[in-house]
Structures are given as structure tokens and as C-alpha cells.
Amino acid sequence: MPKLGHFSGSEICKILEQQGFQMVRQRGSHAVMQKRDDIATVTVPVPMHREVRIGTLSSIIRQSGAPRSAFET
């Protein structure tokens, strides 16, 4: 399994937007991304840091349901 890459918060937001998420708000150092469909709404907070830690990135991937391959190097 390839390793997860190092991404900034803005890079993560761009990847999530490609997966159908929209930024609904940003306050302080966190942006909130949201994806709605007929069944449920998925909300994911993204820290807008220069480099997001690997554990935090793993949590964002798990919460969003985005494919891990989009974040691998």
C-alpha cells in the first residue's frame, strides 16, 4: 500500500471538491467541507495548516469516504 502524501489544508480541500464536496464555511484555522446526496449529508472539518499531519489526513479520508488513492504519492 503506497504511503499517504503530505498535503496542505487547501490542497486537501481541492481534492475533496473533485470528489463532490463543497466548502460551506471557514472560521479560524478550519474549513468545513460538505457533500449532500439523497440519503445523507457528510460533513468534514479540514484544518487549513501548511502541512496536515498523517493521522489527521487519515481521519479526513475515513470521514469523507474519499478514495485513499487520491491522497497517495
Regions found by a protein language model. Give the residues of each.
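Short helix-start
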Residues: 35-44, 51
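Glycine-rich, flexible loop/turn motifs
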Residues: 3, 42, 67
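N-terminal first-folded block
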Residues: 1-27, 35
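Short linear loop/turn motifs
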Residues: 30-33, 72-73
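Amphipathic, hydrophobic secondary-structure cores in small proteins
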Residues: 21, 27, 31, 43-47, ...
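C-terminal structural segments of small proteins and small subunits
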Residues: 48-73
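Generic anion/oxyanion-binding catalytic loop in active/binding sites
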Residues: 1, 46-49
